[in-house]
Amino acid sequence: MADAAADPTAKLTESTAKLQLDEETGEMVSKGELKKRMAKRAKKAASEKAKAAKDAVAKAVGAGDSKPAPKPKAKPEEVVMDPEAMFKQGFLQEVYKERPSENVVTRFPPEPNGYLHIGHAKAIAVNFGFAKYHGGVCYLRYDDTNPEKEEERYFTAIEEMVRWLGFTPYKITYSSDNFQKLYDLAEKMITLEKAYVCYCGDTEIKLQRGGEKGASPRFRCEHANHTVEENLQKFRDMKDGKYKPREAFLRMKQDITDGNPQMWDLAAYRIKTDTPHHRTGWDWKIYPTYDFTHCLCDSFEGITHSLCTTEFVQSRVSYEWLNKTLGVYEPMQREYGRLGITGTVLSKRKILKLVEEKIVRGWDDPRLYTLIGIKRRGVPPRAILDFVNELGVTTSVSVIQIKRFEQTVRKYLERTVPRLMMVLDPIRVVIEDAEPADVELAFSPKDPNMGSHTIKFTPTVYIDRADFREVDSKDYFRLAPNKTVGLLNAPFPIKATSYTKDETTGKVTEIRAVFDKETKKPKAYINWVGTEGSKKVEARIHNSLFKSEKPDDAEGGFLNDINPESEVIYPDALIESGFDEVKRRAPWPEAAGESELGMGGPESVRFQATRVAYFAVDSDSTDDKIILNRIVSLKEDAGKV
């Protein structure tokens, strides 16, 4: 114990481990110093608030209203979210009560025509989570009824995202598994006089459904009067390729007088002959529509609760009508509000435009809100599920600001990833009287289970350019000429004695310094990286891809709203040697689809760069070059939408 007490490195390590981040200045300071600063700011804020309240009262009195300003609400304490909360209460609890079942069966039925986005994460969490909570199972069913838009890469990516979020499908099925069964039921519909072959074009169909504004009387087309035998023959002719696409289609004979458009004789089968199906090849020339396929596949698979978003509320009527008409098992469809996010675009067409214009690197660009983009950025899967759970599930559409999503991610990372020291824009500092020393650093000041690692303090270190000023000021507490600042976990604070500049660029290239052994507790501490074991990395700082919350409303279209600072690259950043152990022990954390050591891609190597941001390794990294993506900042960026 005596040796430890005499060791300045040990004392400083113990002392600096208790430092806290001043979020306003980005400095690490002692608890006492932070308390003083916060008190000063609170006093200033209270003064400004009192003045504003006084002005408001004066204004109100002048208007004949002397009511005092309302008291501010107390800030609620942070509550740890129950990961099963959305199934225990509210909408999903009521859904289960409507049809309680010992054998809950749900399904997630995406179309394999694009990459999933953040909204699909809610659908995955709701359907798989509902089944899991009630001890049931969930199918992953590909709704592969449109060969013109389906590609193998989408099938693969969808399954990967489901598993990455921590869910295992009970079975992976395809609507195309049931093509023959669906066809047979379509013929049965004809024999029941509940379907007919129609030759009408778009203009005629619009007239039948009430015209341009829906003000005219609705009526059924003359083709509905054909006999069962005629319709059967013509439907078989469609199957045999005797019609070209759009020359004929099979319609359900529903109720054209019903006020619900989903009962206006919807299409059941259409002709598609230009592209082979990814699984059945050229076997079929006709394909069932979503409205015909979806409810029947739910029935075939014994789905108990068919959970979908509220744009399908009207479809519930046709869903139930078709199952009843055919006399098959009837699942229960219920609808919840979808998840949207402002400040970005989720449309496949618009994202494709961004890719084609090379505004982003691809569908997995970390600035996009595709799930593969969010994953590449380094957002942990469990954080996404926490976000969905925090929002809850109701019948209202949730349109959320990006900052709300990032708050959840930040809160999750704070307690689950290790801390390392890193500098984005390094300046060399030569400490003239320093000796090499070992410094032990905890990976987390709050979680001892994360362990610790040892780095080497060296006479030459690197600090961030943002932590040095050539001209000092009273309100600046970091390094400046003849000024002292603490280096996190270093033996002593340092004082800058001189600096050198590049004559061409005017940038500082080197700072000379000495230990300041007289100053026991500097007002601020900054991070540093030594020369031994450190690594050069490329750090990509991702900001919002768009300048506004509503890029679609921008004059000239969403492409005119691109933020020119959406990606800022630091090509020469440095990270300390503890990175090697963090990489070896990934994933951070072990949760959801990254539940075991070694599971997860490079993005599962996550950490907090002290005083900088949260980062993850990018998939562009190689053995010779490490590339990091900023996941989120340490605090909400000022001015962020």
Could you tell me what each predicted segment is?
Residues T106-N113, Y139-D144, S299-L307, D365-L371, ...:
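Glycine- and acidic
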Residues K44, A195, K244, P261, ...:
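Intrinsically disordered or highly flexible coil/loop and linker segments, enriched in small
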Residues F312-R316, E320-L322, N389-L391, V399-V641:
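Core subunits and conserved enzymes of cellular information-processing
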Residues F128, F155-V162, Y183-I190, R236, ...:
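Short, well-ordered alpha-helical packing segments
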Residues D3-G90, E94-E98, N543, N563-S566, ...:
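Auxiliary tRNA-acceptor-end handling modules of aminoacyl-tRNA synthetases
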Residues P331-T408, Y412:
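Long, charged, mostly alpha-helical binding arms that flank functional sites
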Residues Y174, L192-I351, V409, P418, ...:
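Active-site cores that bind ATP or allylic diphosphates and position pyrophosphate for catalysis
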Residues K18-T289, E330-Y336:
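NTP-dependent nucleotidyl-transfer catalytic core
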